[in-house]
Curated annotation (Swiss-Prot):
GO-annotated biological processes: DNA recombination; DNA repair
Alphabetical UniProt keywords: DNA damage, DNA recombination, DNA repair, Metal-binding, Zinc, Zinc-finger
Gene3D superfamilies tied to this protein: 3.40.1360.10, 6.10.250.240, RecR Domain 1
Stated role: May play a role in DNA repair. It seems to be involved in an RecBC-independent recombinational process of DNA repair. It may act with RecF and RecO.
Native organism: Nitrosospira multiformis (strain ATCC 25196 / NCIMB 11849 / C 71)
Name by which UniProt lists this protein: Recombination protein RecR
Amino acid sequence: MNAPRSLDELINALRCLPGVGPRSAQRMAYHLLQRDQEGARRLADSLDYALEHVRHCEKCNNFTEEVVCELCSSQRRDPALLCVVEMPADLLMMEQAHCYKGMYFVLMGRLSPLDGIGPREINLDRLLKRARDNMVKEVILATNFTVEGEATAHYIGEMLQNEGLKITRIARGLPVGGELEHVDSGTLAQAVLERREVK
């Protein structure tokens, strides 16, 4: 016996989430339909609302409902510092560590040629434009210490080397292969304080 077409479509839709395979998607679909229909409605409404209202900030590329996000609009931030992170979760970790008061640029990924992710896919043209805005003096590369994160940091360092900017890399208080999202705020704060210049 085959499942109803609408149930199959829901299961396949849930598989687009990271780390969700066919069995997990099936369990989620059954749970939402059988045990938590109110939760399913909230999920559908929230997703619909987010798709309609959330966009990328014109300056930092982070998610926002405004043209320019709250961080980029703040007069309390230091516009001379620009911290480059891979994902919004990395920006959130930096903010929770209370170790940085400059501006950000969120790549929304990292270079991964095997996955078809090159400079265009992670908005390096927008990063270059932002770095050239005459306010930025230092670019802090806070990509993850994974192979792809290191390659991304190296590529950006090379791209910006002739722009008259100080280019630094967060210190390796973070474990090799580690991702910012999973690091405690104290370790992250120390890594930012001990950043080193990229040569």
